[in-house]
Structure formats: structure tokens, C-alpha cells
Regions:
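Active-site helical microenvironments for divalent-metal-assisted chemistry
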Residues: 1-169
């Protein structure tokens, strides 16, 4: 192999190692996963959740430059892999909507019902309190996680999938 080709191959390999492992982040990929799971998902509700989240996040982009909606889709895909229900998948698609857009929990409740609204609200509340003291923050995070689990463990599962996806993009 000529020296120039070796250098190019080495540069490409080094660049590839710096890139995060891509996850399928299209809604079509999520729908494929939903269908392939063989579970009885409420596609109408999940489609409506995607449409609301996609419209709400339409002008937002991640640091990578990809549309923001790719993150909620990836979180929803993780939940499908775990065998979670339609309400959890819909809530995952909208988990940042109330926090980062003008859409309110009341609007989500009107369009999707109390169960989905409670899940979205629970995930939102897990991230809202800010602390300057690390020990206080850790204690409060533990308290919030325990409270969320006592109300509906799905809130914690959605939040953990959210954190997992955020950590995967930095690998």
C-alpha cells in the first residue's frame, strides 16, 4: 500500500473513532421498531405525540447540528426495546416539550389524557431544580427519583433512557 493511502486510511480510522455510534433517529425507524416488537401499540397516540413534539422542536437543533427531535425519538426507541407501553413511548417523544417549548402540560393533558401528561410532567420535574451545592443536588435528585418511582416507575424509566441516550452521544 502506498504511503499516502496508509496515511489516509489512518486518518479516516482516527476520525471514525471520534464519531459517536449512530443510532437510528428517524420516526420511520421508530415505527419499524414498534411494529417489529409485535406488541399492541396505540399508533394513533404515538403518531400524534411525534407530530406535536416535532412541531414544538422544529426550530431546535442539537450541538451536533442534527434536529432536536432525533433525541426524543432515540429515547422512545430505547423504551420500545424495553417493552414499555404506548403511554411511555408517547411521553418519551414529548419529554422535553413542556420544558423547552411553549407547549404546556395542560395542553398535553387535553390532547393525550392525564396518564401521558403525568409522565411528561414527572420527567420534566426531575430536571427543573438547580443547586449550587453538589451534596444538596445529589440528595434532592435522590429524593425526586424516589418520589417519581412512588408515583409511577415509568417516569424514572423514561428519565434513565433520556440520560442513557445523552451519555451515548458522548462515547
Amino acid at each position: 500500500m502506498p504511503e499516502e493511502a496508509k496515511k489516509n486510511a489512518a486518518e479516516q480510522a482516527a476520525q471514525a473513532q471520534k464519531q459517536p455510534v449512530p443510532m437510528p433517529t428517524t420516526y420511520e425507524a421508530l415505527r419499524h421498531d414498534l411494529i417489529a416488537s409485535g406488541r399492541a401499540y396505540d399508533f394513533d397516540m404515538i403518531d400524534r405525540a411525534y407530530q406535536l413534539a416535532s412541531a414544538a422542536h422544529a426550530t431546535q437543533f442539537r450541538r451536533s447540528g442534527e434536529p432536536y427531535i432525533c433525541h426524543p425519538i432515540s429515547v422512545a426507541q430505547l423504551l420500545v426495546e424495553l417493552g414499555m407501553d404506548s403511554e411511555s413511548v408517547a411521553a418519551a417523544l414529548m419529554h422535553d416539550v413542556a420544558e423547552d417549548t411553549p407547549v404546556t402540560i395542560d395542553e398535553i393533558r387535553q390532547k393525550f389524557g392525564s396518564e401521558v401528561a403525568l409522565l411528561v410532567d414527572g420527567v420534566t420535574k426531575l430536571t427543573q431544580i438547580k443547586f449550587s451545592n453538589v451534596e444538596d443536588r445529589k440528595a434532592e435528585n435522590l429524593r425526586k427519583m424516589l418520589l417519581a418511582m412512588s408515583q409511577d416507575v415509568r417516569v424514572m424509566i423514561i428519565k434513565l433512557c433520556d440520560r442513557l441516550h445523552l451519555s451515548l452521544i458522548h462515547i
